[in-house]
Amino acid sequence: MKWSDIMWEDHPFSSAECARVKCDPYTVSIVTEINEPGLFEVAILNEHHTFVNLPGIHPVDTDPFDDVLRYQTQEEVVGIIRKIESITGNEPLNVYS
């Protein structure tokens, strides 16, 4: 998946934009950082819609309850999606509200 493939929507609770990309069994939630143009926060959810930390994506020393990756660049977001695609073997698809 390329950056240009990600489909954006208005965030329902803020002035941010958001996108969700499904790569079974995971969903990647991407939200623009409102006060940091060009940066994004990323969360990964499992099939039960629970936040998860994945090895190779989240830093090893991450607090297990700190599951949102803040201040990610476009390249880092695409890298996260590609890593999940590699882990799962499934093609990433946009999810619409």
How would you describe each model-predicted region?
Residues 1-37, 63-65:
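Negatively charged, low-complexity tracts enriched in Asp/Glu with abundant Ser/Thr
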